[in-house]
Amino acid sequence: VEFTTGNYKITTTPRREWQYIVDNVPCPDMGHNRRLIPISELLQQEVSQNANLSEVEVIAIVLYTGPMFQIYNTILRQFPEDKFSIFKDGDNLYSTTIFVLVSAVQKLSRFTRIPLGTMLYRGLGGKMDLPDIFFQIDSKGCSGYAEWAFLSTTSDRNVALGYSGVKERRPKAMVMVIETSSIDRGADISEFSQYPGENEFL
């Protein structure tokens, strides 16, 4: 199934992405400072060793940091429906890959040193409003929303601004600011990222 990413407008397929990452087939789309580090090298990094990551976990992280994030998140959100139905009807919801990616993030989050109070940012694209309920405080003093997919964030405010829709002058451009805590802080996946300049936290 061929698809085009919303961020860097890369047209690719899951098979091609697998070949670039696992089989070391040369990738023609190396713009935006994309890098493809061999999986064998990533497995030797200190963070991989400390978190006891398996080869398939490293592969899943690297795939997510490239164009495949769009497929995995579409499946988890079941949206957009027309895109989701392609994978559902094809009986391939990437269940194993998503399970392995969750495992990798959980392992990394235990060994990733993110100082308390670190601010992370997420650009929201500028195409939609947050619902009113997002801002309403419930009886327990909480507000917000549940994200069904992986929530990519960055420690670099300027990267988030690039994803916010502000450059395109979209009317609803915004950046979400998230303060990390000791309870649920995710993982720094920048060392594995195909786009290291994004300083990605998942």
Regions found by a protein language model. Give the residues of each.
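Mono-ADP-ribosyltransferase
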Residues: 1-202
